């Protein structure tokens, strides 16, 4: 426990060690063992980050969000559903830290769904369950209390070159997402690349996508 010192007067020491940990690969055993430190870090906002840590080329919000997203994507025990919510994900999504929420969504898109290795074989090898990701997206869209930037982070959930989701379903989800994001999207290449696919199966939702995105 001395590796990650806690206490209001030891933030600099804590963040020095914590930053180094987050910059490395996530291991299931450590994720479980260090649960209390993830919980502590989730409760800290950027206003508490030491100035020196803000200038180093590593985003602490992105770092913890990436670890949580990896755990959610790969570990069966880490769930976020109506009935079952892992304590850390419950804390992330019941709070108002939009930066961490946005980075969580964005990494699932960048690192999993739009990963260059994204195939059925790769998902199986990495223990990624597409239905789990779909259910999460639906659950987030059912909420009305999140900031538009969080919904805009779903842009990376549209893989521009590989068929991850059913096009009809994806067109519907993206139309709803753009309504929640006020027409903003943090990466539009995937969506724009798939407009012709959307139009063939769901022209009504495709028009909504265009309307929300353009106007």
What are these model-derived regions, one by one?
Residues 1-215:
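Non-catalytic all-alpha helical scaffold/repeat segments
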């Amino acid at each position: 426990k001395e590796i990650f010192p806690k206490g209001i007067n030891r933030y600099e020491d804590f963040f020095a060690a914590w930053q180094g940990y987050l910059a490395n690969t996530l291991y299931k055993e450590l994720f479980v063992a260090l649960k209390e430190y993830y919980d502590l870090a989730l409760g800290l906002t950027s206003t508490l980050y030491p100035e020196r840590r803000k200038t180093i080329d590593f985003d602490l919000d992105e770092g913890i969000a990436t670890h949580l997203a990896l755990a959610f994507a790969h570990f069966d025990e880490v769930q976020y559903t109506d009935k079952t919510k892992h304590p850390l994900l419950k804390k992330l999504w019941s709070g108002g830290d939009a930066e961490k929420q946005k980075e969580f969504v964005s990494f699932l898109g960048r690192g999993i769904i739009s990963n260059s290795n994204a195939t059925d074989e790769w998902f199986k090898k990495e223990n990624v369950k597409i239905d789990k990701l779909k259910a999460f997206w639906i659950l987030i869209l059912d909420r009305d209390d999140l900031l538009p930037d969080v919904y805009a982070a779903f842009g990376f959930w549209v893989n521009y070159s590989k068929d991850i989701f059913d096009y009809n379903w994806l067109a519907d989800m993206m139309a709803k997402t753009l309504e929640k994001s006020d027409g903003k999207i943090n990466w539009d290449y995937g969506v724009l690349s798939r407009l012709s696919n959307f139009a063939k199966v769901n022209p009504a939702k495709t028009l909504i996508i265009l309307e929300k995105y353009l106007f």
